[in-house]
Amino acid sequence: MAEAKTVPVLFLNDSIVLPGMVVPIELDDAARAAVDAARASESGELLIAPRLEDRYPAYGVLASIVQIGRLPNGDAAAVVRGERRAHIGSGTSGPGAALWVQVEEVTDPEPTDETKKLAGEYKKLLLAMLQRRDAWQIVDMVNKITDPSALADTAGYASYLTGTQKRELLETTDVDRRLSLLIGWTGDHLAETEVNDKIAEDVRTGMEKQQKEFLLRQQLAAIRKELGELDDNGDGSSDDYRARIEQADLPEKVREAALREVGKLERASDQSPEGGWIRTWLDTVLDLPWNVRTEDSTDLARAREILDTDHHGLSDVKDRIVEYLAVRGAAPQRGMAVVGGRGSGAVMVLAGPPGVGKTSLGESVARALDRKFVRVALGGVRDEAEIRGHRRTYVGALPGRIVRAIGEAGSMNPVVLLDEIDKVGSDYRGDPAAALLEVLDPAQNHTFRDHYLDLDLDLSDVVFLVTANVIENIPSALLDRMELVEIDGYTADDKLAIAQGFLLPRQRERGGLTSDEVTVTEAALRKIAADYTREPGVRQFERLLAKAMRKAATKLADHPQAAPITIDEPDLVEYLGRPRFLPESAERTAVPGVATGLAVTGLGGDVLYIEANSTEGEPGLQLTGQLGDVMKESAQIAMSYVRAHAKQLGVDPEALNRRIHIHVPAGAVPKDGPSAGVTMVTALVSMATGRKVRGDVGMTGEVTLNGRVLPIGGVKQKLLAAQRAGLSTVFIPQRNQPDLDDVPADVLDALDVRPMTDVADIIAAALEPAHEASTAAAA
């Protein structure tokens, strides 16, 4: 730095002056005093520095006075030129009213190669930005600057830099650092400018295109009018819709509503989005089959043949469809109208575990009726508008799934399958299940009104088939409107027949095989059903058959001489691996305190093991296994009954004055319901007496404090599960005996089903004799 010298100082509030800049300064009292002092001084210079709120400025610019005059508004001003940076020292005294400070000039070192490289990079960015703005005079001026420091200080004129950035440039004495800052700031601004210019160009191009399209449409309309294709009241599109409405077979109210919308279309501006909304609505209305109905087939023999060909078993559903056809055929033949004046529709809910054929049954029903078939998946639907549609005030509004299904079917009397209705949810957008109340109510659905159409749609001719896994998840008001048909799963004989008649031929064909090349014995099929799947349906059964066919196809491809292949029971380990399910009831109940119960889940019936144990400690009852409130109460009732009737049951009361623990595996699965009462009593008595429960026995029923066995639900599913689990004796409540009429005969033949009224009788029959327990204990 040079020697210190004393100069008058002028602090500016809003401006930053860098070396090389020529700027006007309005002369207020302080500025005039500083300018006068500078002109009177020997050097003729003054220091211009920014006024900072938080600190005293460290650097300023020594400036010379170029001219004194007036601004266009008449105010006095001085034009100054920044000459050199200076470091500001302490204040001092001087002549006149001006403030004086001591300063030291900052001298720039000779530029290095790195400095020149940075200067070249910055100049390239600066010239690119100036050329984009067509500032060619400034381009010429910048090209003439060779000093890197002077080039960097031209940024004082840059409008895209903030006051803080310019002040940082003023205080940065290192030229390399100054150029690096400017390269970053200018590069960012240039990129932002390019994006803004691109957006502006896109907007301008879009506006020009829109104006061009508008002009061409006006010219096209004028040409068509001259050719006589239009009258003075239409615009082409509206007349086209009028003609389509007149030709369409529409109900009178629908025709009137459509013509009103055409009138709105004629009055709508071409630039208004309303025109597009009206056209979409008119297209939707005209595409619906308002008066189109297919003729039902009333051939009962043909219907039975179709249903039996596609599905094995399911007699309840098949009988209901045949009854429906019989009524449909008999009423017109006798000149009788449908009761109540409603249409020919029906609403049935097919409830059962997965894989029993509920969804595929819908297509078979449609074929049997000679009707169109449409499937509507409801799983995961949470928006009421999915059912009723969106109101036309919303952008992108569409009709609901019911209206779209009718349009897709092309008739007003299709078979509509509403799949997985128990998976419907609800949130802030409404409850789809509540919207289905009107759809599935035969007394109301002849005037179903979709929000989008806002017209009455007659759904009374539609056959609605609804599928569900868990009936309890369907709202009671909705379930009340439907005819319930429960499909409880297949027996072992059913699965064998399905595999031989449906699954095996299909998977053999998919594997490119024939019956001459690969066969599966009946024993192998029964083994797969019993030890590899153990499911109510046949989905996993079919997957395993597909796996076996793939392995057989691979074997034949590697060794063609291996044909024909016969897969028998001993060969299953080679094709399917080891069995996944083995009879375990005998193993589970091999110790006292374990009883086998029966339960119903969303996947059908299943066995439920209840374990009881006792330990030293304060008397009490501990329950584990994620039990629900009802099941916890059943455990309390069972414990109270055993305590009260200990003598009759042969239980030592002291054995119950311990810490009793009841556990229901699996612990990660929530469980609830009253039907485990008798099983809990049996497990407690077995634990207290040391007598094991017979391994081939299962039981179900609710128990009272007096030991009465009350009826429960799901008898058919539970007996099917007992057969799959390899049980031979099942105890059920006496009042559930009428439910045995619904159980397949082969299941009843395989099981010894004993209706009981008193839990004491169940205990006497289910527990091993006392002398056997004593012998086992001694051994």
Swiss-Prot record:
The keyword Protease applies. GO terms for biological process: cellular response to heat; protein quality control for misfolded or incompletely synthesized proteins. One of its GO terms (molecular function) is ATP binding. The active site is at 675, 718. Induction: By heat shock. Its main location: cytoplasm. The keyword Cell cycle does not apply. Homohexamer. Organized in a ring with a central cavity. Oligomerization is Mg(2+)-dependent. PANTHER family: ATP DEPENDENT LON PROTEASE FAMILY MEMBER. Belongs to the peptidase S16 family. This is Lon protease. It comes from Mycolicibacterium smegmatis.
